[in-house]
Design a protein with these regions (language model features):
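Gly/Pro-rich, tryptophan- and cysteine-flecked surface segments typical
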Residues: 24-347
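Bacterial N-terminal signal peptides that target proteins for export
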Residues: 2-10
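Bacterial N-terminal signal peptides
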Residues: 10-20
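Generic low-polarity alpha-helical segments
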Residues: 1, 18-19, 212, 281
Length: 347
């Protein structure tokens, strides 16, 4: 009896060991559990920060009523004004346009992207600076957005906030002060995500159209944002069976509806997730970023993303829903770098 019990304990111990190995298999740095220490808590759409990422924006130059985005940004500091350098990244060309937004203490502001950058789809990075355009530690910015797409997808998404890990922010001067490098290394700014997850993918056969939006975060914004490159992913059904997939893209924002064509799996998606069933996926870029000029190495690429679901039966079925959310962050990159131009705020 004792021998049988001991054998059972050994089997359980082996299973826990294997489970721990599987959990640590994702590339990148594990997200920390202790969020009580400043600099440990990572990017989130439920907090304030010195950098905000709005994961998608769009607008139609012809019919802004049908396709548009409203950006909302708030300065939660009750004493100090905020200078915010906005960077609008074209998801297809990776070209960058910019503007300054200045907020007084406790002020909030909203604008339509059809007024500032009509006809472009991409993402926005907002950086807190001083009046001279130099990045500073100012963990009081928060934001959200309302987005509607001509396909019928819509969502209210919180802006991802990245706070600084220290009040003494070390801003690396580039090109003799013409530009500044933002280091997301857990020492200056908090780290950015590497492995992303979509925790629920409903069946297409039930009227669901799930759109995926992926953003490469990094690059020299005086030249252009970095491109995504190659991906690898794992797709699970609700019975824990798994298949892998891969794909490549030459843009800095990738947008596609989950279907039998994307991601290409064997068997196809509709077989893996049939009517009445669901699944989930995690994915990550397989390339590297050369961060050696900033004290790094060939580091993992940083990624953020959004998932938007549209169900054509929403008004006729109790189990049909539409909306969107930011993707879950599974692991982090050791270092990500954004280089921004530096010049005085124009407001």
């Amino acid at each position: 009896m004792l021998r049988t019990f001991t054998r059972h304990l050994f089997v359980i111990a082996v299973l826990f060991t294997l489970a721990g190995t599987a959990l640590s298999a994702d590339p990148g740095i594990e997200l920390p559990n202790d969020i009580s220490v400043r600099g440990v808590s990572q990017s989130s759409d439920q907090k304030k920060g010195s950098v905000l990422i709005f994961n998608i924006y769009n607008s139609s130059p012809i019919n802004a009523n049908n396709e548009n985005t409203r950006i909302n940004i708030t300065n939660a500091n009750g004493l100090t004004d905020a200078f915010i350098h906005l960077f609008f990244i074209d998801g297809n060309t990776c070209n960058v346009a910019d503007a300054f937004l200045c907020l007084t203490a406790n002020q909030t502001a909203s604008f339509l992207t059809s007024d500032l950058d009509p006809g472009i789809t991409g993402y926005i990075v907002a950086v807190a600076t001083n009046e001279n355009g130099i990045p500073i530690s100012f963990d009081y910015l928060m934001g959200d957005e309302y987005v509607k797409i001509f396909t019928g997808h819509f969502a209210n998404l919180g802006a991802l906030a990245i706070s600084t890990a220290t009040d003494q922010l070390n801003v690396t001067s580039v090109n003799e002060g013409i530009s500044a490098a933002l280091l997301f290394d857990g020492i200056n700014y908090q780290r950015l995500p590497h492995v992303l997850a979509i925790n629920n993918i409903p069946a297409r056969a039930d009227g669901n159209d799930t759109m995926v939006v992926l953003n490469r975060i990094g690059g020299d914004y005086s030249i252009g944002a970095s491109k995504i490159g190659s991906f690898f992913g794992l797709l699970y059904d609700d019975a824990e069976s798994v298949v892998s997939y891969s794909f490549s893209t030459n843009v800095c924002q990738y947008r596609a509806s989950i279907s039998n064509a994307f991601p290409r799996t064997t068997p196809r998606l509709d077989t893996i997730i049939p009517s009445g069933r669901s699944g989930w996926t995690k994915l990550w870029p397989t390339g590297t970023a050369d961060n050696r000029p900033f004290g790094g190495a060939a580091d993992l690429i940083s990624l953020t993303g959004v998932v938007l679901n549209k169900n054509s039966n929403m008004k006729s079925s109790s189990n049909a829903f539409s909306g969107g959310r930011n993707m879950h962050h599974m692991t982090l990159t050791p270092l990500a770098v954004i280089v921004i131009p530096v010049f005085p705020a124009s407001c």
